[in-house]
């Protein structure tokens, strides 16, 4: 229990994590107020009656009365109302910082531009299967503070750059940045700002896991901090990687020790091999038994909307990667599936487009040229993507997702893969990426 119950805690921004922070601080006996720019913010009816509320705009007066401001991850610290409070010396933190103060339970902290939900869920399952009392959440599923209700012995947290911006000295047991590619530059300004936010995950960390295929994931930490890497090449001693046989068999390995064939994983594609290796390294860091982890890998079916296998129609496999909302995620999906079907002369037909968030789509050129037979373009930034991919492959426009799926089917031949991985946000045509994914599945189900 925290001793001080003095000054006012002001939560800025409701939504899932804001509601969680209000309720947690209230239960702990703090004076709590909340402000949100929306007239009726989501969750306004899920907080205690005696919490002071100020909705319709961020209440500068209220913020300036705070002893501390708890900022929801959806709000940028750069907002003028928040900057005014910072200028007055008022600390601005996030719910993850509140969580760290409130518990001594070891934290496994996971971030990355892509694959963090898959790795967080898979690793949580590994810990559970190994008999740990584990709670999984953060940016995924349940907010961090709600996890304490489970009285866990281990916290597995997926953390976004927005959450890490307001977190210092997380002191994680082990932390990993899975990969780094352009994302959220509209919020962080440039790649450096994004990089700095992500690397806050390593403050006070006890052990580090990093991706040796991506130098931006390797932190500057004291030499005494144990570090272990994963990657898709042959690993050095005590590192995780891939050993390839002459017949094309791929083994996930630790040093020279072969652990499991890639074909034994339920989730396919080289990007998922990297995810599995990251989990094995995290598991070693907290002492999970190898045999148990390998068993979990054989069973884990992946997540909805994340390179999710939908069905096979006329010997063509359809994958829903609607969660691919940035270029890095789509690259991973195209490369992962493209490399897997290449030995059988299979090609990818990819559906791209939506709201591009100012990204550089030319980063897709090399992979599109290598693996993609046709790209079907949808959404408000289709034109921009077409310009970036000119002369790489067949580029076709579609006005609806249904039209895109129909066109994709016309290009596809046996052994090919049709992949929805838009590299864009979805709000121009859909309620969100789950809606886009469900509509894609419905379109595929309607194919004959």
UniProtKB/Swiss-Prot annotation:
Keywords: ATP-binding, Cell cycle, Cell division, Cell shape, Cell wall biogenesis/degradation, Cytoplasm, Ligase, Nucleotide-binding, Peptidoglycan synthesis. This is UDP-N-acetylmuramoylalanine--D-glutamate ligase. It catalyses: UDP-N-acetyl-alpha-D-muramoyl-L-alanine + D-glutamate + ATP = UDP-N-acetyl-alpha-D-muramoyl-L-alanyl-D-glutamate + ADP + phosphate + H(+). It comes from Acinetobacter baylyi (strain ATCC 33305 / BD413 / ADP1). ATP binds at residues 112-118. One of its GO terms (cellular component) is cytoplasm. InterPro entries: Mur-like_cat_sf (IPR036565), Mur_ligase_C (IPR004101), Mur_ligase_C_dom_sf (IPR036615), Mur_ligase_cen (IPR013221), MurD (IPR005762). It holds the Pfam family Mur_ligase_M. Belongs to the MurCDEF family. GO terms for molecular function: ATP binding; UDP-N-acetylmuramoylalanine-D-glutamate ligase activity. It comes from the Bacteria. It is found in: Cytoplasm. Cell wall formation. Catalyzes the addition of glutamate to the nucleotide precursor UDP-N-acetylmuramoyl-L-alanine (UMA). Pathway: Cell wall biogenesis; peptidoglycan biosynthesis. One of its GO terms (biological process) is regulation of cell shape. Its EC number is 6.3.2.9. The keyword Cell division applies.
């Amino acid at each position: 229990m925290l001793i001080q119950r003095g000054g006012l805690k002001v939560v800025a921004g409701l939504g899932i994590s804001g509601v969680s922070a209000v309720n947690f601080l209230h239960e702990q006996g703090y004076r709590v107020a909340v402000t949100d720019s929306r007239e009726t913010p989501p969750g306004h009816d899920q907080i205690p009656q005696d919490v002071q509320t100020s909705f319709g705009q961020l209440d500068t007066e209220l913020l300036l009365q705070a002893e501390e401001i708890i900022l929801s991850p959806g709000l940028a610290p750069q907002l003028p109302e928040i900057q005014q409070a910072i200028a007055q010396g008022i600390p601005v933190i996030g719910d993850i910082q509140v969580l760290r103060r409130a518990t001594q339970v070891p934290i496994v902290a996971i971030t990355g531009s892509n694959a963090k939900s898959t790795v967080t869920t898979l690793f949580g399952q590994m810990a559970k299967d190994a008999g740990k009392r584990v709670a999984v959440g953060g940016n995924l599923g349940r907010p961090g503070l709600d996890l304490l209700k489970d009285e866990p012995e281990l916290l597995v947290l997926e953390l976004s750059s927005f959450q890490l911006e307001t977190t210092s000295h997380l002191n994680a047991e082990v932390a990993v940045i899975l990969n780094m590619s352009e994302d959220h530059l509209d919020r962080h300004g440039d790649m450096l700002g994004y990089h700095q936010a992500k690397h806050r995950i390593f403050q006070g960390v006890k052990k580090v896991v990093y991706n040796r295929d991506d130098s931006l994931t390797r932190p500057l930490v004291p030499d005494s901090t144990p570090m272990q890497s994963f990657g898709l090449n042959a690993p050095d001693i005590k590192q995780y990687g891939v050993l390839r046989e002459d017949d094309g068999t791929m083994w996930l390995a630790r040093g020279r020790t072969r652990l499991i064939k890639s074909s034994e994983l339920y989730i396919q594609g080289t990007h998922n091999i990297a995810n599995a290796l990251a989990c094995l390294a995290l598991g070693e860091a907290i002492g999970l038994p190898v045999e148990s982890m390998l068993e979990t890998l054989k069973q884990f079916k992946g997540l909805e909307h994340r390179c999710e296998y939908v069905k096979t129609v006329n010997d063509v496999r359809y994958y829903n990667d609607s969660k691919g909302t940035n270029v890095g995620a789509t690259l991973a999906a195209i490369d992962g599936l493209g490399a897997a079907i290449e030995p059988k002369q299979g090609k990818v037909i990819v559906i791209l487009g939506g709201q591009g968030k100012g990204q550089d789509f030319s980063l897709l050129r090399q992979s599109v040229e290598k693996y993609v037979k046709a790209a079907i373009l949808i959404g408000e930034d289709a034109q921009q993507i077409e310009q970036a991919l000119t002369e790489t492959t067949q580029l076709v426009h579609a006005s609806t997702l249904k039209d895109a799926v129909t066109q994709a089917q016309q290009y596809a031949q046996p052994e090919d893969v049709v992949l929805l991985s838009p590299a864009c946000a979805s709000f121009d045509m859909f309620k969100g990426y789950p809606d886009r994914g469900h509509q894609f599945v419905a379109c595929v189900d309607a194919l004959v």
